[in-house]
């Protein structure tokens, strides 16, 4: 599978590094502004907390037209952390990059795989180590984040993913679409072998897919407190974009795939937490300026764009009331 994801020169560089204990993968696309501080912060944490382990920081790029790859290649990381910057082949999207990291972990016989986002502004040195520790200690097979986010950054999670996951599957996990997580090598290998990497899972559906598979296939899962998540939101988007369609489309496809599970009407159970941590309120300075007028304009634009679907989904009386 590795030969279909990377060119031969990239495969050679992977072979030169050899085996690893922990791989931290960072999918990138047009992240030239943010990749350096994220890499620096991650490497600092790995060098401090896991100095006795062989850690590899992998940047997996999706063909960025900016200087993302050049910036990542120029980064000097503290020993013993190794750096690997590669571009994958195939469907462009975060899921394809995650798939590539899973395949690299298999080849390098890693014990733990961590995935982080490339535009994190609030990342701390211990984020990757906090996520990896329950995996390295064989306590859990996947660790997902628990953090607070300023509005409306977490709208998809707060309004759809979290309530649906809790209601249908009886799983109280606050961030089922969190973009940061750690997995055991075995679980990562099983996910990599699934026949989903030509679907929206290869794009922005990957995060909710991984969490849902873990919850419904009896994979040992824990939550890890990371505090507050702030990312590099270049501009506030209140419209339906490909990210929304891919992520929520995957969410609803999973609802259909696992229909037998939610028809069982299981009781809600909280996912356990691992370790300590803080969950402070987001600083007011980081709260985006969302006005009632902007929300209203976005709603009207959505109504116009999806009138045909509204006619299918809503009764005439409901449509009249909305108008």
Indicate residue ranges for each PLM-predicted region.
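A conserved acidic beta->alpha catalytic loop
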Residues: 61-69, 120
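N-proximal low-complexity "stem/linker" segments adjacent to membrane-targeting elements
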Residues: 1-44
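Conserved donor-nucleotide/metal-binding helix-loop-beta segment in metal-dependent transferases, i.e.
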Residues: 123-145
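Conserved donor nucleotide-binding strand/loop of the catalytic core
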Residues: 55-58, 69-96, 104-107
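Short beta-strand/loop segment that forms part of the nucleotide-sugar
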Residues: 26, 50-64
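Short beta-strand-to-loop acidic/aromatic patch adjacent to the donor-nucleotide binding site
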Residues: 109-121
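Short beta-strand-to-loop element that shapes/binds the nucleotide-sugar donor at the catalytic cleft/hinge
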Residues: 143-155
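Terminal low-complexity segments of carbohydrate-biosynthetic enzymes
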Residues: 248-323
């Amino acid at each position: 599978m590795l030969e279909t994801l990377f060119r031969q020169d990239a495969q050679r560089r992977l072979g030169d590094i050899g085996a690893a204990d922990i791989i931290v993968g960072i999918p990138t696309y047009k992240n030239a502004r943010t990749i350096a501080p994220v890499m620096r912060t991650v490497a600092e944490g790995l060098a401090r907390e896991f100095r006795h382990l062989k850690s590899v920081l992998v940047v997996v790029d999706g063909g960025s037209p900016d200087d993302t790859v050049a910036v990542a290649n120029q980064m000097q990381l503290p020993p013993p952390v190794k750096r690997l910057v590669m571009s994958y082949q195939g469907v462009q999207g975060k899921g394809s990059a995650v798939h590539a990291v899973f395949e690299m972990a298999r080849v390098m016989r890693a014990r733990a795989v961590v995935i982080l986002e490339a535009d994190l502004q609030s990342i701390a040195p211990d984020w990757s180590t906090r996520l990896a520790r329950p995996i390295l200690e064989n306590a859990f097979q996947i660790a997902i984040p628990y953090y607070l986010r300023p509005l409306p950054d977490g709208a998809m999670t707060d309004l759809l993913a979290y309530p649906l996951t809790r209601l249908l599957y009886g799983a109280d996990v606050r961030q089922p679409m969190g973009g940061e997580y750690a997995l055991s090598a075995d679980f990562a290998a099983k996910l990599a072998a699934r026949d989903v990497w030509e679907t929206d899972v290869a794009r922005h559906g990957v995060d909710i897919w991984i969490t849902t598979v873990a919850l419904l296939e009896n994979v040992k899962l824990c939550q890890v407190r990371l505090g507050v998540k702030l990312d590099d939101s270049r501009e506030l988007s209140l419209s339906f974009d490909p990210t929304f369609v891919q992520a929520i489309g995957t969410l609803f496809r999973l609802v259909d795939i696992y229909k037998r599970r939610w028809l069982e009407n299981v009781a809600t159970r909280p996912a356990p937490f691992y370790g300590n941590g803080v969950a402070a309120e987001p600083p007011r300075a980081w709260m985006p300026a969302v006005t009632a007028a902007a929300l209203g304009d976005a709603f009207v634009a959505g109504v116009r764009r999806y009138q045909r679907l509204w006619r299918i989904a809503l009764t005439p009386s409901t449509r009249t009331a909305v108008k």
